[in-house]
Swiss-Prot record:
Organism: Cellvibrio japonicus (strain Ueda107) (Pseudomonas fluorescens subsp. cellulosa)
Molecular function per GO: nucleotide binding
Record carries keyword Nucleotide-binding: yes
Database matches in InterPro entries: DUF520 (IPR007551), UPF0234-like_C (IPR035571), UPF0234_N (IPR035570), YajQ-like_sf (IPR036183)
SUPFAM superfamilies cross-referenced by the UniProt entry: YajQ-like
Signal peptide: none
UniProt record similarity statement: Belongs to the YajQ family.
This protein's record includes keyword Transcription: no
Full protein name: Nucleotide-binding protein CJA_2652
Length: 160
């Protein structure tokens, strides 16, 4: 029986490259000369630090551009509010990976609502969709791509 998995993954290597490229761009920019501005990454958590909130916003734009160039969807960023400590302004971000229970339930409900001849089941941080025909699965993929669910999704493990 044909099936595929709906997942939300971010490549760690591409994320590291994006953060490193953003750091290089910031160190070379004229308006950041003499400013203590830096990006720090630990697993899927990114912290940006600068002297002013305006610079923090510019750094966020640079990071988003670098992520887009590396093929990472910027909608997976969960950005927290700014924290001020002395001269420094900080902002923490988390790169969301995996499909949480609420989103998985939305995906299953969307598949059932379209009355396609497929079944969707939640398996941890992914959703498995099975059906009798390959065409039904491809139609389901098109439906999920068209839906705005607020999280980037990939479709992998497609089996006949």
């Amino acid at each position: 029986m044909p099936s595929f998995d709906v997942v939300s993954e971010v490549d760690k290597h591409a994320l590291t490259n994006a953060v490193d490229q953003a750091q290089r761009l910031i160190t070379n920019r004229f308006d950041f000369k003499g400013v203590d501005a830096k990006f720090e990454r630990k697993e899927f958590d990114i912290t940006i630090t600068a002297d002013a909130d305006m610079q923090l916003d510019q750094m966020l734009d640079v990071l988003r551009t670098a992520m887009a160039k590396n093929g990472i969807d910027v909608s997976c960023l969960d950005i927290s509010s700014m924290k001020t400590s002395g001269k420094q302004v900080k902002r923490d971000m988390t790169v969301r990976t995996g499909i949480d229970k609420e989103l998985a339930k939305k995906i299953v409900a969307l598949v059932k609502e379209k009355k396609l001849k497929v079944q969707a089941s939640i398996q941890g941080d992914q959703v498995r969709v099975t059906g009798k025909k390959r065409d039904d699965l491809q139609e389901c993929i098109a439906t999920l791509r068209a839906a705005e669910l607020g999280m980037p999704m990939q479709f992998n493990n497609f089996r006949d």
